Amino acid sequence: TLSKLCGILGKMWTFRDAADPRAQACAEAEKTIIEAIIPDGNALRFNIYLSGIHEKLADIALASKDYDTAVKELKKALDYAIEMEKAQTSGKQYYACLILDHYDYDYSDSRQWGSYAKDLLERLSENIKYNPIRERKDFKALYD
C-alpha cells in the first residue's frame, strides 16, 4: 500500500543525517510519489507524511546554511500539519484522486492524537538546530 511505501521511504530519510544526500533523495522521492498518486492535493492522512518530509527538507536546508529555503520548508510543514488537523476533525473522508478514489479514511479514532501543528512548533522552539533562523521575521511568523 501507499502507506507502507511511504513508511519505508520515511525510515530511509528519518534516520539519516541532514547532510547525507541520500536523506534528501529519499524525502524527495516520497514527496514525489505522494504528489503523483494524489495530484489533487486531497492528501487526507498523507498530510502528516508531507509535513514530516518538509520538516526534513528544512533540516537539509539548514545543514547547507540555506536559511531562506529552511523557513519556506518549515512553513510548508506547518501548513500540512494544519491540514491534517482539519481532516481529523471532519470524520470520514474519501480520496478524490483516481488511484485512491475507492478508499476512505475514518478519523473518528484519531481525534485524540493531539495537535500536529502544536507539536511541530514545540519542536522548533526547543531544538537548538533552529537557532540560526530563530530571530528571522519569517520564522517568528510561523507562531502567529
Positions of PLM-derived features:
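Alpha-helical protein-protein interaction modules
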Residues: T1-R136, K140-D144
